[in-house]
């Protein structure tokens, strides 16, 4: 390692986040920040990439990077195999947290809340617009299970291709979407000397309460 971890740092000086710049509810601000990220972030950063944290039935946390695939007034939607590790964890504990980090903008958004499955119709609608290889993969891959090697996975894919050689694959019952219904959304804007701006929204009795947090 050419540089000590203790010496690795950068100062954030791009922008600030004041209360008079923030709306009374968080979705409008997220839409604004997300649009900024889409325009600003460059490959390999994906603006809709986020870390999803879940907790299993034994209280152990797990996290991974996923892509946000839906956003509306209800919440934030992603898709996965319901039999996967994350699916099992959400079945045991239906709460999760998301984090978006947009380094070019020096911004981060943290979201926490309850997670519920979307309707089968919503899952099918998204499934049908995926590339064919991804649709076949949803059938072929026993996600999160131990396999003997890459050859086994490729064999499963070939078998799935043969199965659907004369027809288009439909959305499997074990695959679909989850929607995180936010109860807390924090917007973080990096500032100089680690004196960052943090605006936190909490859902209280159906209304969003906005407050500033110390960095």
From Swiss-Prot:
Keyword Oxidoreductase: yes
Cysteines paired by S-S bonds: none
Cofactor(s) named in the record: FMN
Protein EC: 1.4.3.5
Pathway: Cofactor metabolism; pyridoxal 5'-phosphate salvage; pyridoxal 5'-phosphate from pyridoxamine 5'-phosphate: step 1/1; Cofactor metabolism; pyridoxal 5'-phosphate salvage; pyridoxal 5'-phosphate from pyridoxine 5'-phosphate: step 1/1
Catalytic activity: pyridoxamine 5'-phosphate + O2 + H2O = pyridoxal 5'-phosphate + H2O2 + NH4(+); pyridoxine 5'-phosphate + O2 = pyridoxal 5'-phosphate + H2O2
Similarity comment: family membership: Belongs to the pyridoxamine 5'-phosphate oxidase family.
Name the record gives this protein: Pyridoxine/pyridoxamine 5'-phosphate oxidase
Protein species of origin: Pseudomonas putida (strain ATCC 47054 / DSM 6125 / CFBP 8728 / NCIMB 11950 / KT2440)
Source lineage: Bacteria, Pseudomonadati, Pseudomonadota, Gammaproteobacteria, Pseudomonadales
